[in-house]
Amino acid sequence: MAAARPGGVSPGGETSRGTAGPPRKVSPGGETPRGANVIGVLALQGDFEAHTKILQTLGAQPREVRVPADLAGLDGLIIPGGESTVITLGIEREGLGDPLRELAGSGTPVLGTCAGMIVLDRDHLGVLDIRVQRNAFGRQLRSFEADLELVGVDGGPVHAIFIRAPWVVEHGAGVEVLAQVQAHPVAVRQGNVFAVAFHPELAGETRLHKLLLDTLARRTADAGSRGPC
């Protein structure tokens, strides 16, 4: 299912780069495009800036999320790769745990990448009914790249960069496995929540972000078709 290519991976994964600075909203030209979907990117640590750039190219309005107030009015959320322990401690420090659970529970589309998959699992936020193994493929020197066929993603294989990546060791019946490597799930979906063990943003891969936006569009269309009570 995956054609792996060792090497050629820039430092990242559970990384220390992209440490959060002062809160700011991101938009081209400093203005929110009219009618654009507002997608939050958790910006406590990690490679959140790469996600904001991809969202901008897709016409969405990214917002860096550091405190609960930043979650207000979001149409979707991305939890990026980085150091899962640092991100988890930041969530606890800023009081983001319950607000993040409520956001996911409301049906808002959520995507977690690499460390984001860990943050979403049973042992952390508990948003996804999965249990993961950290650094499952080995440490930094065992990082690799692979082309994966993902269920629900058209246009050929997704180029995936695995850096100190996790894999899923256990999941509930309500979790759909979208891709595997070495017979272990590395991409999953449970309702409105997606998680992948790799870094699409480091490869310039936009289809996972499009999947998030497409899920949002279907949710909006379904709500509109029901009309007022």
Can you describe what each PLM-predicted range is?
Residues M1-R93, E102, T206-K210, D214-C229:
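N-terminal beta1-alpha1 cap of cysteine-dependent amidohydrolase-like domains
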Residues A2-A3, W167-C229:
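C-terminal and late-domain segments of enzyme folds
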Residues L44, A115, F198:
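Cofactor-binding loop segments of dinucleotide-utilizing enzymes, especially the Rossmann-like FAD-
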Residues Q61-R63, V110, V193:
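Hydrophobic anchor at the start of a short beta-strand
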Residues I78-P80, L111, F162, A195-A197:
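Structural motif
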Residues E83-E149:
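Cysteine-nucleophile active-site neighborhood
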Residues D123-H184:
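Pocket-forming structural segment of enzyme catalytic cores
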